[in-house]
Amino acid sequence: EGLIVIDKYTMILSANSSAWNLFHMDRVCQGESVYCLDREEEFRHAIEQVLSGEHTELVLKLNGSDIQLIANPVIRDKKTEGAVVLLVNVTEKLERESLRREFSANVSHELKTPLTSISGFAEIMQSGLVKCEDIPQFAGRIYKESQRLLQLVEDVIQISQLDEEKTPYTWEPVDVYQVCKNAFESLKEKAKRLNVHLYICGEYMKMEAVRTLLEEAVYNVCDNAIKYNRNDGSVSVFLTQTAQEIQIVVKDTGVGIPKEDQDRVFERFYRVDKSHSKEIGGTGLGLSIVKHAVGALKGSVILRSEEGNGTEICMKFPKVHKE
């Protein structure tokens, strides 16, 4: 937090180093007018307002950052003798609020689609317009949309918990090979249905991790690799280790990701092929969950892809957890 004390003539009487840093000043401006820090009209108006005896608050744009200014007049014998100006960098806070609003809007939109379908099918059935032989088909559609809805709710809960970072995590030795094997076991029916072959290459290895987070990360990467693959394609997991690090690489033979989309695939609800997103399924939160889970495990994730030639996602983790 930056702190500046000025007199009634706008001269700087005192300021801390944080204040100079927030204004990107390479010198101390004590004894000069506070206007030397920022000559924008908004800042000038705030200073004039506080020196007229009014409490003032606003957010300034300084060098690409959002800085909250809180100014209080110093009053003696009913006269304003100066002011105390507090400066707080709120860039991260405002970004989080913006992301939260965007997330809420996206969740509402994503929930509306399956709910509208379920409501529509149920209304047609209730009206008696459906032939008896068509009822299983309509019921199947309702079931499919309800499963999509459940998956979305589960993913939203998962990513909200990761965002809050309040969940007490239990770190323990985890068999990485077994985690990958379990993910393939859970996905084998989907892979079989889409005619995608699954392979694990590596050896038994352990790392200190939060088991549920590692399982979420591996499962979601493998799930995406299967969904966006081609007929008779494959998904291969390669496990390697060094003295300090575990590396999990998931490589597929799928459609690949265009270069212009590669920086955005870890964003919430971002889908590369929006026209086929409903057909392929999923909530658009899978890779966002991966990013959060890997980050919580103090790891890193790297994506390499070429449109038409598959995708490779590399997750690196430290073997030993350090507080």
Where are the regions that the model predicts?
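Short acidic helix/loop segment immediately C-terminal to the autophosphorylated histidine
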Residues: 126-133
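PAS-family sensory/regulatory modules and their coupling/dimerization elements
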Residues: 30-92
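Short conserved segments within the C-terminal catalytic ATPase subdomain
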Residues: 190-200, 204-205
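Conserved micro-motifs of the catalytic ATP-binding
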Residues: 164-169, 202, 206-209
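Short alpha-helical segment of the dimerization/phosphotransfer core of two-component systems
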Residues: 144-149
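Short conserved segment of the HATPase_c
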Residues: 257-271, 291
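Conserved glycine-rich
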Residues: 298-299
